[in-house]
Amino acid sequence: MKTNCEFPLLCLLIVLVANVEGEVEDTGLKMVKRLWRNWEDPEQRQLLDQEAEQEKQLEKRLWRNWEDLELRQLLNEFAENQREKRLWRNWERRQVAKEDDGEKPKELWRNWEDLKRRQVVDLNDEQKTQRDKRLWRNWEDNHATLRKRSADSLSRQKRLGRERGKE
């Protein structure tokens, strides 16, 4: 029996009283001697303190693990309830769809296909518009470059003509 007693005299008194009452026999005196030796030996006392601290840490860790387990169980129950609700709603929707003789799902499918087709057409139109804008910008840039070159060429010709006229 390991005991970490901070007050060895109190431990001695408890063991002696227990001996008198007949609850502890030979082991009581041995325990008192061991407690007293441990109290006198600082290294042994330090080891006992470390063991006590490790036991406290273990208890804390076990408690946290238990709390984590309970929380996980609650979250799993909640998720299971949500899944059951979702399954029930889906089942109800299928029942309503079956009652409509299957026309409603077919109509929804056709609407969805039409929507997808329109999205593709809109995307193609947008791409064409972007391409046309790009082509127009390129044409404008090229035209501006050509005008600038011809203006530069014209001014160069005028300058050369003036220089020739001076000669």
UniProtKB/Swiss-Prot annotation:
Propeptide residue range(s): 23-94, 112-118, 139-167
Location of the protein in the cell: Secreted
Residues modified as Pyrrolidone carboxylic acid: Q95, Q119
Expression by tissue: Expressed by the venom gland.
Keywords linked to the UniProt accession: Cleavage on pair of basic residues, Pyrrolidone carboxylic acid, Repeat, Secreted, Signal, Toxin
Any one GO molecular function term: toxin activity
Region (Disordered): 147-167
Entry superkingdom: Eukaryota
Region forming the signal peptide: 1-22
Main localization category: secreted
Renumbered ranges of RLWRNWE repeats: 34-40, 61-67, 86-92, 107-113, 134-140
The protein's name in its UniProt record: U-scoloptoxin-Er5c
